[in-house]
Amino acid sequence: MGKSVVVLGAQWGDEGKGKIVDLLTDRVKYVVRYQGGHNAGHTLIINGEKTVLRLIPSGILRENVTCLIGNGVVLSPTALMQEMGELESRGINVRERLLISEACPLILPYHVAMDKARESALGNKAIGTTGRGIGPAYEDKVARRGLRVGDLFDKELFAEKLKNILDYYNFQLVHYYKAEAVDYQKTLDEVFAVADIITAMVADVSTILDIARKKGDNILFEGAQGTMLDIDQGTYPYVTSSNTTAGGVSTGAGFGPRHIDYVLGIIKAYCTRVGGGPFTTELFDDVGAEIARKGNEFGAVTGRPRRCGWFDAVAIKRAIQTNSISGFCMTKLDVLDGFHEIKICVGYKMPNGEIAEYAPLAAKDWEGVEPIYETLPGWQENTFGITDVNQLPENTRNYIKRIEEVTGVPIAILSTGPDRVETMILNDPFAV
């Protein structure tokens, strides 16, 4: 009987999902993206060769895998063509192995222009978006005015819809944000130049998945960003514009929730965050700088430096409850090599003096929150590239065990380096 496994970020994104998805895809027939857009980069290193995927599922590097982009993904034709070109130049057959839902909202130049105009207007109160038009595209979807992949089949109607929506956007860009208008003909020409390529890959993703499940095929759902950036369950308003939690699989790919067998939450051995928003365990000292240096903590898409801090078990508990996480994969364990002490946040001291074991929902409720730490001895040995858990230093194993105890979730996979071989699978999600 086949298994359906969700791989998602349990923190604020950048946990190393791409490597783990790639690692597990030798077991699956389908890899599915179900939310987000090209705003999150999934970095894979295979035999020393680096690949950054932003939109196409990470399974594309496995020849036997079919990749699906579900309706919950906002799709930029420009980004898709660029990524396809990069992969095809390396001999990877994308067009015959990538299928796209006709219900995917399109990201077009006016979305990008609006995204950048808004962030500029907010100044130092900016949310910290990637400026790739993700939020405005989701707005159009909810407002039921957006153009979708399926609209590309009728070019005359597409052109008419585009004119109406561009009038709406340009009025705001010019008169409210004092920005340049987006050119209608240029936008239309750019989309039509690639429309036939995209429509040739259109398929009924939900039905494909249902048939695959009934046949007993293994399916992997690849999440983007992280749980604490979920539009509903994250630190609002410092969140992304999609549902990054496991529930997004049902709404973003048309896959029934009862058919999900395992949810693998990806966690770093510490915490990072890009952009604004609450971060209780953030470090502003030399320790934080050293974690950032050793972990090479810069965004795969934006290049922005990531904020770094100790592991936050309180925030993780919210991820566990909202995702029904079955097991964790801990990445970047080797980054903590050499520290004399390592801390785990096990509680929050609220401004009123109360102790909280679960993270607040809204960003405003995090103000004045202080972390309550448990300190563990570190280790001086090198763990980089270790693939046998018994070869890990005793203090490393104690740290892992303590995180399991505090969170109540077992660690199924350990990653000690960026390459797919630098991994320990303690409990295979597809074998459970």
Swiss-Prot record:
Catalytic activity: IMP + L-aspartate + GTP = N(6)-(1,2-dicarboxyethyl)-AMP + GDP + phosphate + 2 H(+)
GO biological process, one term: 'de novo' AMP biosynthetic process
Source organism (scientific name): Histophilus somni (strain 129Pt) (Haemophilus somnus)
Name of the coding gene: purA
Identification of the protein by name: Adenylosuccinate synthetase
Subunit structure: Homodimer.
One Gene Ontology molecular-function label: magnesium ion binding
Residues at the active site: D14 (proton acceptor), H42 (proton donor)
Required cofactor(s): Mg(2+)
UniProt main location, coarse: cytoplasm
